[in-house]
């Protein structure tokens, strides 16, 4: 939708003005915006991107990532890590918001459990017949 392209562009420009950790914003068309960050900052979760915006920051350890994860983060996608290692990372750092750890490309796959909730249980009704 054209409005999404415009909102994505405006959001990228607004973030470039507000936050000093943006190194570059690259896009060849309106489908994908790549925003390179120098580091995370305390309001990183407010610097979100939508509709095809990818933010990239290089970190030395996953512990740096744990500093910005809050209850708004529900799914951790991965490439190049074992599930067990990431499970330990989430548990050891007490990352309460993370309730799904899935490979990249599977983040939108829906199962019976979604974002920590039993979908069937929440959308079903039990009728007792006596």
Per-region residue spans from a language model:
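Short beta-strand/turn micro-motifs composed of small residues
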Residues: 80
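NAD(P)-dependent aldehyde/semialdehyde dehydrogenase
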Residues: 1-77, 85-96, 101-121, 126
């Amino acid at each position: 939708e054209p409005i999404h392209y415009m909102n994505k562009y405006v959001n990228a420009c607004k973030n470039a003005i507000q936050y000093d950790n943006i190194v570059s914003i690259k896009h060849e068309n309106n489908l994908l915006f790549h925003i390179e960050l120098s580091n995370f900052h305390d309001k990183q979760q407010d610097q979100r991107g939508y509709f095809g915006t990818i933010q990239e920051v290089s970190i030395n350890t996953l512990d740096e990532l744990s500093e910005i994860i809050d209850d708004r983060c529900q799914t951790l996608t991965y490439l190049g890590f074992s599930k067990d290692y990431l499970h330990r990372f989430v548990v050891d750092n007490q990352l309460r918001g993370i309730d799904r750890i899935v490979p990249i490309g599977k983040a939108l796959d829906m199962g019976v459990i979604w974002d920590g909730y039993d979908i069937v249980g929440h959308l079903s009704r039990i009728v007792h017949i006596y």
